[in-house]
From Swiss-Prot:
NCBIfam families on file: murD (TIGR01087)
Name this polypeptide is given: UDP-N-acetylmuramoylalanine--D-glutamate ligase
Annotated gene: murD
Record field: catalytic activity: UDP-N-acetyl-alpha-D-muramoyl-L-alanine + D-glutamate + ATP = UDP-N-acetyl-alpha-D-muramoyl-L-alanyl-D-glutamate + ADP + phosphate + H(+)
Location of this chain's protein in the cell: Cytoplasm
GO MF annotation list: ATP binding; UDP-N-acetylmuramoylalanine-D-glutamate ligase activity
Pathway assignment: Cell wall biogenesis; peptidoglycan biosynthesis
Binding site for ATP: G115, T116, D117, G118, K119, T120, T121
Keywords on record: ATP-binding, Cell cycle, Cell division, Cell shape, Cell wall biogenesis/degradation, Cytoplasm, Ligase, Nucleotide-binding, Peptidoglycan synthesis
UniProt family annotation: Belongs to the MurCDEF family.
Enzyme Commission no: 6.3.2.9
């Protein structure tokens, strides 16, 4: 939609979180008439921002006023099955996400990243690479979307030469119909948010695949060829109008594949373009303590592919990768206290993310896990837990389910708080061993978000450090 068409249009914004308030501000600046409607209580900071913008809002439920709109912008935390959204659709009111709305205003090049795991690290890597290149080439790189800053907050200041690096969740993509990234990256797809998608991984995948639904000739799609679901989709449903670039850990697996790829061979990251393969940089220059594991190598390959597709200079890519030390709350090394290494993996909000962490940390660890369950199948990692974990300390709403799932596999202790869990882990850990905090659940039962959860874990560990 042309933003000019929004002048004078009544728009209901459902949800008064960060993205909802940002969307309302963008709409107001375009001359639309937004109304923000929050089912719960509007936070004081959000209320102050909306008053400053002159945006009306309501809280404690959705009034009949919201259905007087021509357009509805829905916040990512609100499912399409919510009664207010169903009523919008029943009345013929168009429902879009904040990402879709902001894309109508975007003049910059867009690199969109989605997937179950790795999207934050990949988006962070791509942003830092583009930022380093932009400092020399005279453009700016913006890090927006699910990574923290709403797209709507920054889009008005973007110029055509700039690059918007968007981390995108399935929730944000659900409401996209014309959103068209110049470069789309899919890291992987494994079961997550099954509570929202009725236990159907294919429904979840369809939301993720909306990232490329509007891509055309001249655009690029990058996907993890080692992921079975992604491979089946892109090899089975083509041909595609856009360019396809594959990534994977073994270059020999691409024999007979005509498309470009980024992979690994003989300890080097290698790139094939137009049938020619080049050694790009040694893997050892990228992977280091604090940033290790196959899952992070996948993230690096996706970042290299995206940077090459965006025309970023190779020296900026190599320099940024060699300097990268990881992302907070993603297998973050907190420190060695009481003779034990403590690792904060609070961003692990599903079983597959926990699996990746377990594969990286040495055997004999104590595992702290739990939170608000998302339809997790813990049985799928029982053998790995038996191999790598000495005991589990379970927290949150899911602690009973976790205890039941691993009964007979390893000892499980239940803790009423994260602070108590840290103390139990300290008592249980072996000298020279590790404690891994990898919840495999969402944080909203006990914390405001995974970042709050991770910070509280680190604080509890440091408070205990005087043992």
């Amino acid at each position: 939609m042309n933003p000019e068409a929004l002048k004078g249009v009544a728009v209901s914004v459902i949800g008064a979180g960060k993205s909802g308030v940002a969307a309302a501000g963008l709409l107001a600046s375009a001359g639309a008439r937004p109304l923000v409607s929050e089912f719960g209580t509007v936070k004081a900071e959000a209320a102050e921002q909306m008053r400053a913008l002159g945006v009306p809002f309501e809280e404690g439920g959705h009034s009949e006023r919201v259905f007087e709109a021509e357009l509805c912008v829905v916040s990512p935390g609100i499912p399409r099955t919510a009664p207010v959204i169903r009523e919008m659709e029943a009345r013929g009111i168009s429902v879009v996400s904040e990402i879709e709305l902001a894309s109508w205003f975007c003049r910059a090049r867009i690199i969109g990243i989605t997937g179950t795991d790795g999207k934050t690290t990949t988006a962070t890597l791509i942003h830092r690479i583009c930022e380093a290149d932009g400092e020399q080439q005279g453009y700016r790189a913006f890090s927006v979307g699910n990574i923290g800053t709403p797209f709507s907050s920054e889009v008005s200041g973007m110029e055509p030469d700039d690059i918007a690096v968007l981390e995108l969740s399935s929730y944000q993509l659900e409401g996209c119909s014309s959103f068209r990234p110049n470069i789309a990256v899919l890291t992987n797809i494994t079961p997550d948010h099954m509570d929202r998608y009725g236990g159907d991984i294919h429904a979840y995948a369809r939301a993720k695949f909306r990232i490329h639904a509007s891509q055309q000739a001249g655009d690029t799609l990058i996907y993890n060829h080692d992921d079975p679901l992604l491979r089946a989709h892109f090899e089975g449903d083509g041909p595609w109008p856009f360019k396809v670039v594959r990534t994977g850990l073994k270059a020999e697996s691409f024999e007979g594949v005509s498309e470009d790829f980024v992979s690994v061979a003989d300890g080097w990251i290698v790139i094939r373009t137009a049938g020619l393969t080049e050694q790009f940089m040694p893997v050892d220059e990228v992977m280091k303590p604090g940033f290790r594991g196959e899952h992070n190598l996948y993230n690096v390959l996706s970042s290299v592919a995206a940077a090459r597709a965006a025309g970023v200079r190779d020296d900026a890519v190599r320099r940024s990768l060699s300097e990268f030390g990881g992302v907070e709350h993603r297998q973050e090394f907190v420190g060695s206290f009481c003779g034990v290494d403590w690792i904060n993996d609070s961003k692990a909000t599903n079983v597959n993310a926990m699996r990746q962490a377990l594969q990286t940390v040495p055997a004999g660890m104590v595992l702290i896990a739990g939170g608000r369950d998302k339809g997790n199948d813990y049985a799928s990692i029982a053998e790995l837990v038996k191999e790598k974990v000495s005991c589990i300390v379970a927290i949150g709403e899911s602690r009973g389910k976790i205890a039941e799932a691993f009964r007979g596999v390893v000892p499980v202790f239940e803790a009423a708080s994260l602070h108590e869990a840290v103390e139990l882990a300290r008592q249980s850990a072996r000298p020279g061993g590790s404690v891994l905090f990898s919840p495999a659940c969402s944080s909203f039962d006990m914390f405001s978000d995974f970042e709050d959860r991770g910070r509280q874990f680190k604080q509890s560990v440091r408070e205990m450090a005087s043992c």
